[in-house]
Amino acid sequence: MPDIAPSSQPEGDLRYRRVILKLSGESLAESGKRGISDNELLAIAKQIKSAHESGCQIAIVNGGGNILRGASFSGANASVQEATAHYMGMLATVINSLALQDALDSIGLQTRVMSALPVDRVAEQFIRRRAIRHLEKGRVIILSGGIGSPFVTTDTAAAQRALEIEADVILKATRVDGVYSDDPEKNPHAVLYEQLSYNEVIQKKLRVMDATAIALCNEHRKPILVFNFKQDGNIVRAVRGESVGTWIGDPQDTQTNQR
């Protein structure tokens, strides 16, 4: 599939046929809070439905930080081994996936939750061919449990699954407008980047995804679009290839496919 930077398209055009939508666990909670907010769930679900109705096949990878973040939990609880804490974090992603599934179902989408961990009473086992088949049948799939191994972030899981299902792009949903030179909430002079190469992300130590995820995307030329999902309609704009957020990809494509 082509690795090209998005450009402005007439309304209704679809730039990306199949995407991985990476949601943080915190995106399901109210700002600054933990747990799951019904209002946040439905707001995200409605945006996903609009993007799906445009013809895009959508696979979602969500985090679990609104419930439990493995690395930080083990640091604060000496009696819990780090590997165990990571498995607990994976189970948190399953909880989030079930909540998101019901929200999507409630507004008329067909969904499947697939898990890298065996939880067959509530989710299917992740099998690559089955996942692709669900997408081809018009279902939204929610991929939980990371990749089923500790010490691997859900960012890396998103990169891995994007390669497996041959997604055109990873859409990383955040609460800010893209990738900045510094934390925009702390530094009002932080600069928003329109486009970056993978190497620039690494060299500038920009907080986009973890190093393993960036390395995977770099090696396989899988582009990433970082955008603000809190702005209504941005998920649809992203799948159409409109100028939204920060595009990260191969330097050649970044230079020759200006938005």
Curated annotation (Swiss-Prot):
Binding site for ATP: K22, L23, S24, G25, G65, R69, T174, Y180, D183
Main location class: cytoplasm
Gene Ontology cellular-component annotations: cytoplasm
Superkingdom to which the source organism belongs: Bacteria
Subunit structure: Homohexamer.
Recorded family membership: Belongs to the UMP kinase family.
Protein name as it appears in the record: Uridylate kinase
Source species: Rhodopirellula baltica (strain DSM 10527 / NCIMB 13988 / SH1)
Gene: pyrH
